[in-house]
Each structure stands twice: as structure tokens, then as C-alpha cells.
């Protein structure tokens, strides 16, 4: 994404006139009983996210939702923690956390999250999202799930060279407390700290994880081309939660 992200964080790049992360925030604010939104970033971009947060303070305050931006202290790319160690860093800020939605900041999820959230908070089950995809190049660039009875996830593959399923699972995971407690367990032996999908590969062998099949699409802002395509697409067809 260089040079666009040389001095600016990718989740705050504007797509159709709005920061990428705004789309996720809009969806989260539609979720009942949401208690908090927590963003972790590095020291370089901490002030960028703090300014972005100010634009949401009124909306979250009205709903009684706590919102914080955490600085992981990292100043240079070569010392980056990776997404999973960032997650562990945030989890350390809480004495207890019953459940959480863990999401990448550079994806736009073009389908409502609230129905999945409501199923999640009124149960004791871990969920991922499954979208049908036949394009092999796209299948190789994301998480893939193999589904069993009742849509339980039998296997999770992070960016496989040879996809064994047509169900993609984007980087948004609905995790109960028992699953969140396994993040440090995973990090204690694995060197795969970056993509959170590697943790899901581990988790599905330890705890039940189920897929929610949805219709829609995910815009992954992973390259300049995908960024421009997302901007063009959402400029023509505005984002709507009801789709």
C-alpha cells in the first residue's frame, strides 16, 4: 500500500469519502448491548487514531459505549508486534472479558453484523463468518473454512496455496471468554503472530467454532488496486446495512 501508508494508517484511508474503519464503526453501533470499542495501533499512528476517535465520541457517548485507542509502543515496522500480539496486548488491559468481536481494521464488511452479534451474545458459542466464493485467487488470499454438521468449522486454513473449500472466512471473529484466553496459549509456542487466521487454525482444534453463512461481500483493502476498486464500488453503490 506504499506510498499511501508511508505516513498514514491504512484503516483510516478514505473509501467513498469515509475512513475504512468508519464502516465497521457504523455496523458496531447497530449492535445492541455493545459495551466498548477498543482499537490498538502503533506509536507512529496513535495520534491519527485519537483524532479519528474524537469524531465518534458523541455517538458512542450517547449509547454509553466506552471507546479507547491503545498505543502498543511500537515505533518502527521492523519491530511490529503483529495482529495477534496486539490482541493479547489489549486483552491484558482487562481483568475479565466475557466475549469480544475481533476484527481487522482494513476490511469493509458489506452485510449486517447485528444479527450475528445478537446470536453471539445470547449464547455461549464462537462464530466466524462464511461467504461462498469460487474465484481461486481470492480463496488463496483469505481464510478458508471447511464445514461439518451444523456448520461447525472442522478446519480453518489461513491463505492456503490449494484451497480445499469454497467458503471464505474474513478477519472478523466472535469469540467467547474461553477462546480469548487461548490467545496467549497460542502465542507461547507459535511464531505466526500476524494474521489472526492462524490462531483460528489452532482454536478450531481446541473448542467448538461455528460458521454463520451470509450473503454479501468483503472489501479487503490489501493493495492499491483493491483500495481503488473499493473506492470506485462504494462511490457508485453506497454502503447500506440493510443489504
Where are these regions (language model features)?
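N-terminal nucleotide-binding beta1-loop-alpha1 segment
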Residues: 1-7, 12, 27, 66, ...
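Short glycine-enriched, charge-decorated loop/helix-capping segments at active-site entrances
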Residues: 7-12, 74-76, 187-189
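Conserved N-terminal catalytic core of the sugar/cofactor nucleotidyltransferase
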Residues: 14, 18-102, 113-115
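A short acidic, often aromatic-flanked loop/helix-cap motif at beta-alpha or helix-coil junctions
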Residues: 72-79, 137, 162, 218-220
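The conserved acidic donor/metal-binding loop of glycosyltransferases
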Residues: 105-108
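Conserved donor-nucleotide/metal-binding helix-loop-beta segment in metal-dependent transferases, i.e.
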Residues: 111-140
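Catalytic-core segments of class I nucleotidyltransferases/pyrophosphorylases
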Residues: 117-121, 152-220, 224-242
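Short acidic-glycine loop/turn motifs at beta-strand connectors
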Residues: 146-152
Amino acid at each position: 500500500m506504499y506510498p499511501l501508508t508511508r505516513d498514514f494508517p491504512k484503516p483510516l484511508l478514505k473509501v467513498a469519502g469515509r475512513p475504512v474503519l468508519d464502516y465497521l464503526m457504523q455496523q458496531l453501533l447497530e449492535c445492541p448491548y455493545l459495551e466498548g470499542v477498543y482499537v490498538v495501533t502503533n506509536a507512529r499512528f496513535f495520534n491519527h487514531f485519537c483524532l479519528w476517535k474524537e469524531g465518534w465520541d458523541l455517538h458512542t457517548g450517547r449509547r454509553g459505549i466506552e471507546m479507547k485507542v491503545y498505543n502498543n509502543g511500537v515505533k518502527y515496522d521492523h519491530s511490529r508486534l503483529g495482529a495477534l500480539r496486539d490482541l493479547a496486548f489489549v486483552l491484558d488491559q482487562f481483568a475479565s472479558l466475557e466475549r469480544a468481536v475481533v476484527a481487522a481494521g482494513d476490511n469493509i464488511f458489506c452485510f449486517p453484523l447485528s444479527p450475528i452479534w445478537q446470536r453471539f451474545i445470547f449464547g455461549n458459542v464462537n462464530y466466524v463468518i462464511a461467504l461462498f466464493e469460487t474465484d481461486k485467487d481470492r480463496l488463496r488470499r483469505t481464510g478458508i473454512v471447511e464445514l461439518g454438521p451444523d456448520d461447525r468449522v472442522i478446519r480453518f486454513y489461513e491463505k492456503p496455496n490449494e484451497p480445499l473449500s469454497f467458503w471464505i472466512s474474513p478477519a472478523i471473529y466472535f469469540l467467547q471468554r474461553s477462546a480469548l484466553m487461548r490467545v496467549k496459549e497460542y502465542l507461547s509456542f507459535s511464531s505466526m503472530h500476524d494474521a489472526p487466521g492462524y490462531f483460528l487454525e489452532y482454536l478450531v482444534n481446541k473448542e467448538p467454532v461455528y460458521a454463520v453463512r451470509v450473503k454479501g461481500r468483503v472489501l479487503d483493502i490489501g493493495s492499491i488496486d483493491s483500495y481503488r476498486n473499493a473506492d470506485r464500488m462504494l462511490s457508485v453503490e453506497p454502503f447500506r446495512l440493510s443489504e
